[in-house]
Amino acid sequence: MTIQVQQLSPDVCVAPQLGPETMAALADAGFKSVINNRPDFEGGPDQPTSAAIEAAARAAGLAYVHLPVAPGVQTPEEIARFAELLAELPRPILAFCRTGTRSGKLFRAATGG
């Protein structure tokens, strides 16, 4: 299974939509935490739910946080929470959304990068 990952810093990466089936591979690749920035059902009923992804992540030994952010402009509160997660979660961290763009924007806004 190939997972498209974009490295934003030495220990933070972003990726497009991930599902429960990818969590063990992320743990095997050395990731310690996953941040899901995609609201449930944003892509319709076939999109995996946060609960399903969280269960698989925790079973694989990963820390998991669901911080749903709508496409477009991120709020100051969402940016602040993302910054808190970057400071609190075990690294390396992988954040994802539909394409990875939203997660990348959150990272840049939260870090000034």
Question: For each predicted feature, which ranges?
Answer:
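Cys-dependent protein tyrosine phosphatase-like superfamily
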Residues: 1-93, 102-113
